[in-house]
């Protein structure tokens, strides 16, 4: 009976602990443009102060229109040249990106073509790498930062994570240690004889 109680307690502990958040998303420069107003709803909910990590590959490109408007998630912040193997399909050395300045929208000024996150109506530049506290409470949305969407193309893969380890993970680990300790303590001692 005691073993069943320990098993039930362990199952309840696991059921009430939430795992760390980690997921991958594809953000489209046209359909998720801030100019169109439709960010990608990740379905991930954060509270202000929760650890939020976001990353995108530096060689994953998207475009704000005619050349030179290709960039990675950091946006159109400087000269960028084709590698010959990137998404543009252009010969190596062709200028594909340049500094286009900042676009101001929703109370945030960020580079054109950058990856921006929105939580609870508050916006933050994420770029290729962000790690810090969530700036508001709500569901995370991801945007391609631009004033319009009609000439945008391309998409990038974005990895989003949360606090690791979370307090729930620690609680689950400590609960597991307690269950193992309780199970070992209740075992009967075996008499060993030699001879």
Regions found by a protein language model. Give the residues of each.
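Short, threonine-centered small-residue motifs that mark membrane-proximal processing/anchoring sites
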Residues: 1-24, 160-184
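Mature extracellular "passenger" or substrate-interacting domains of secreted, surface-exposed proteins
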Residues: 23-163
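C-terminal membrane-anchoring or membrane-association module
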Residues: 182-195
């Amino acid at each position: 009976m005691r073993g069943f109680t320990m098993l039930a307690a362990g199952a309840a502990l696991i059921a009430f602990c939430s795992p760390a958040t980690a997921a991958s998303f594809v953000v489209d420069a046209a359909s998720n443009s801030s100019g169109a107003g439709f960010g990608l709803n990740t379905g991930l909910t954060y509270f202000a102060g929760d650890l939020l990590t976001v990353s995108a590959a530096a060689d994953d490109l998207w475009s704000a229109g005619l050349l030179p408007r290709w960039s990675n998630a950091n946006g159109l912040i400087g000269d960028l040249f084709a590698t010959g193997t990137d998404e543009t399909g252009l010969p190596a050395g062709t200028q594909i990106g340049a500094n286009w300045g900042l676009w101001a929208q929703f109370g945030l000024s960020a580079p054109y073509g950058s990856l921006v996150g929105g939580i609870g109506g508050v916006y933050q530049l994420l770029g290729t790498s962000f790690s810090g506290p969530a700036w508001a409470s709500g569901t995370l949305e991801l945007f391609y930062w631009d004033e319009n969407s009609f000439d945008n193309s391309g998409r990038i893969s974005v990895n989003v994570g949360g606090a690791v380890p979370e307090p729930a993970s620690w609680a689950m680990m400590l609960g597991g240690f307690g269950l193992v300790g309780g199970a070992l303590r209740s075992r009967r001692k075996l008499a060993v004889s030699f001879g």
